[in-house]
Each structure stands twice: as structure tokens, then as C-alpha cells.
Amino acid sequence: MQRYFIPKEQFGSTSVRIEGDDAHHLVRVMRAQAGNKIIVSDGLSREALAQITEVDKAVVTAAIIEERPMTAEPRIQVWVAQSLPKADKMETVIQKGTEIGAARFLPFVSERTVVQYDAKKETKRTQRWQKIAKEAAEQAHRNRIPVVEGVHSWKQILEQAAR
């Protein structure tokens, strides 16, 4: 069953609204129709089984059938500190790490990093990585979306580890 993380504001008491990329995915890719069931979560405190009632190009509306208890994430949180690899390999690290349960990703620039790091593109890159983490969490049926931080220096990584 498909799982979607939606903002808390889109959760009503008896229904949910799915908008944006997730609505596009449901309508165009999954070809969802009224009557299909999905799981929706805000990634924080609510998870529900819902049945699609209305399908539009930009918005999918679903009635909440039952609220589900959120299963606990592991008590031990795994953080992945990864020096920036070549090409799009960081995306693979985030995707696979999310699927196996990582809670946070800390990309960093080290002395031996080959990639030419461009600080101007950091915001866009971090947003892309966060989107990949969200999609991997949906696919792996995780309850929470891992945090993908901006690029750090090795010294900053060591300071965070000391806390």
C-alpha cells in the first residue's frame, strides 16, 4: 500500500488533502482512483489509513478510515557522516541509508574530497537530498523522514559528535 508524508496542515479530523508532487504521483504515476486506499502520515505524530474520495489534477482528497498508532523508530539513532562523493552518489547513500534506518545525514567536505564544492548550490542540493530521503522513507514504510543537513567541514562533524 502506498505511503505518503503530508504536512500537518493537510490533515483534517475526518479527511486529508494531498497536494503538489505527491498528488501528481498518485494521479499520474499510480493512476489512483476513488476507492483506492493509501497510508498518510505527518511524519511526527499522526498516521492513518485513508480511502481516496476525490481525484483532481492538483489535489487528491481522502477520507480517514482509521487512525493508526505510529510504530516506534529504533531508540538508537544512526547518523551517517559522508564525505561528498563524486557525481550523484550522495543520492544513493541517502536513499539506501534511509531504507535501512538512518536518522540523520551529515555530508561534509574533507581534505581528500574530489568534488568541487559550490556553496551557492548548497540550498538546492540539500533540498534535493531531503526529497530523496522523503521518497525513500515512504518506500521503506518508515514513520519519520531522516534529516539531511547542509554540507559541513570535518571539524564541524567532530564537534557535533562530541556533543
PLM feature spans:
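RNA substrate-binding interface of SAM-dependent RNA methyltransferases
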Residues: 71-163
